[in-house]
Every structure is written in structure tokens, then in C-alpha cells.
Amino acid sequence: MKIDEVLEKIFNMRTINKRITNESLKQNNEKLKKIYELLEEPCKNKKIVHIAGTNGKGSTATFLEGIFFAAGYSVAKFTSPHILRFNERILVDKEMISDEDVVKYYEVVMDILEKNSLQINFFEITTFIALLYFEAKNSDFIFLETGLGGRYDATNVVNSTIAAITNVSFDHVSLLGNSLDKIADRKAGIIKDGQLCIYAQNLSELENAVKKETDNSVNVLKKYENLQVELDTQNYKTIVKIFKNENLDESENIEDKKNKYNLGKTFILPLFGKFQANNFLIAYEIAKIYGISDEIIQKGLDEISLAGRFEIFSQNPVTILDVAHNDDSVRVLVESLNELFKNDEVIFILSILGTKDIANIFEKILEKNYKIFITSLKDVTYGLSANEIKKNLENANILTNNIIFEDNILDAYNQAKEMILEKNSRYKAIVVCGSFYEIAKFKKLCGKRDEYF
């Protein structure tokens, strides 16, 4: 089979089971475990860091990949979704899986499914392709990102070494539950039999969910509470300074402690946004468990790039691409923009999937008086046209007078550029966000290589 044919078949599996089968979640999980066994349990004895969380999974996995690769290890990384190529999801030593290997391991999985009259969905077969590939490559460490939730996720068929949870907030509530308790329970479901769990959020619901699964956990925000985070607004980087807790006079305030003892170690993150410090702390803690030096950690960070995470696509005009796609990620995106621009200096171009809380997301953007273009994602799963989003906003009684509805994202971008170039224009930057698919579509129309998305 050829790669185009295989990718078409894989993407058509999005219509099969749609993440959750008609069976109960537990039954589907048992089916996935059966398939995993039939595939001879790839990566069974590997060192695996399993990463769950509402936001920040991809950044955390990439921090780990960069650091451990710089330390001389062979590293594998599985993330989702991709932006330009399906192969982006499956990396070994920072190199994408080849088309030939996608075809090879697709055929292995399909042979098992056909012989046992089993069906699985898009994400599930992608997970099994990745695990088979990682087994063949014999990587030292595997960094495995969940697709949705954790407890019943396809990635949870493996026995991981360390569980990592970035954070918990509201997203996919129809599938994960409508409370933080329920969502946290799903995320904490990746923890295996009392194994070490490292997480990065001071949230009681998450702390309680973790404690139900293990007595062996580290909240890095508490462990490294003496932390200073600054933004390098000239180079779009984040500066993190970690201060040791020992030998400090508890009667002094935190600033006095930092200045007096100067015990900090400074790291420069290539990703912009104070929230990235939380993701980095998880990677830092895991790196220290395996004895990786601070110098190697920084070397690994220096060699990292990650598309769609406050990505500077253009400097003239300033164009920022960000995959923020839910309440929490849009909130932190706005916080980062506040460090660079005034509220009325930014033009947003975005589209949002129909599965998201559209009203809440737009309220966070509209309250800042940004100019907004809404575009169409009608051609992707769960995507909406600009007019459909308009109806959603009107039904939520959200004013749309500062919004331009333009289905074509390239036309929206050209109009936004014209607004910036006008004489005495107040606008200084364009931000494209709302979905991985929005970023993919934008890059496609701007001449970047694109395959199925």
C-alpha cells in the first residue's frame, strides 16, 4: 500500500467509534488491552513517561525530549494532534516516522484487527502504530502524551514508569465530565499501582485524585515554590529561576531570600509564556531523577522548537500562531499578549470547533477589546463555518459588533495586514489561534507543506 492510501484509511477511521464506542468505556478499554496483547505488548519493558493534562502536554513532552536527547539518550515522543503532517505525531530522536514505517505498522495492526473482527478509531490505531515503531527503534525513553483524559485513553494500555499531569481545567466536558473532580479522576487514571506521579497545579481536585491513586507524588509548584519567572519580550523567551529551599531564614520574605542568598539556577525556555514554567518544572524534576545536569538541561532547551506555541510566524507584520483552543489556554495566551501589547493593538484570527465552549472562549477575548476575524473550519471534523459560530455567539447574547466574519482565513489575514499597514494604525500584531486545525489551515494557505489534517 502507498502512504496516501493508508492515511486516507486512517483518517476515515475518525467516523468509527468517534473516540468512545457504544460499549462502556471499560469494555472499550478491555478491547484495547486485548489488541495490545495480540501485538505482543510493544514497549512493555521500556522507560515511559506518560503525560496527561488539559493543556501543556505537548510542551512538557517536548521539554523532556530535548533534555534527554541532549543527555545522550535515544528518545521517542508521541503527541497529538499534528499541524502539517501525520508523521509529526511519532518521533524518534527528533525525526519523524517515515512514510514506509507508517504503512508497515498500519498493516501489522490491521492484520490483527481483521483476524479478530475488531474495529478501533483514528487515535487508537495511531497509538498502536507509534508503540510498534518505538519498540522496533529500541529507544531509551518514551514520552507518551494522552489523547483525551487518561483512564480510558488508548495510550493507557502501557505500563509507564512515571506519570505526569500538567493541569486540570474544563475541556471535553461531554466526554470527561462536567466537574473538575471528574476530569481530574480521568487524568489521574494514568497512574499505575502507586507509581510516581509528578504534577504542576495547586488544585485540590487534582491533588485528591492523585492521592487516590498513589502515595508517591510530587507537586512541583510546591517543591519549587521559590520560583521567579520573567518574560524576555525582545526574544520571545521565558526565563525561569529556581531557588533552593534549604538554609533560608523563614522570617524573611521571598524577595529578601532571593537577593540575600542568590541560590538560583537560571534556565531560558525557548517558548514564550509564564505558564510554560509549570510544564518545564515537570521536565526538570524528571531530568533530576535521572541525574541530568543543569548544563545539559539548558543545552536541551536551547535546541527546542515547537510549532503553534506562541510561534512567531512573521516579524513584519508581527504574526503569532498559537494552538490555544479552550478557556484556560486562551486565558494564558491573553496574559502573554498583555506583556507585549495594549488591548487595542492586537487583531485575532480564529475559529473554534463545535465541541468547545465557544461563549466562554470569546468572552475572554472580547473583554480585551481586540479586533476579531472569525473564519471557517467547516472542512474538518467538528468544525464550524464563520456563520455558525456567529449564531452560537448570538444565542449566548454576545455582541458581535467588533467581529468580522470571513470564512477564508487567507482573506482574513490579508485584511488584517492591511489594517496594520494603514497610516497611523493602532494595530501592531496579528494572532492566529483557536485550534490546531486553524494553524494547519493557515500554514497550508501560506505556502507551508501540508498533508491530511
Give the ranges of each region predicted by the language model.
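Glycine/aspartate-rich loop-and-adjacent alpha/beta segment that forms the canonical ThDP
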Residues: S435-F453
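Short functional linear segments
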Residues: M1-G53, T60-T62, G66-A71, F78, ...
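Hydrophobic alpha-helical packing residues
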Residues: L64-F69, F134, I365, L393
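Beta-strand->loop->alpha-helix junctions that form or flank phosphate-binding loops
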Residues: I198-Q201, E213-Q234, L269-K274, I296-E303, ...
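C-terminal helical cap/extension that packs against the catalytic core
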Residues: L203-E213, V318-T319, F362-A429
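ATP-dependent carboxylate-amine ligase catalytic core
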Residues: I20-K26, Y36-K44, A70-V158, F170, ...
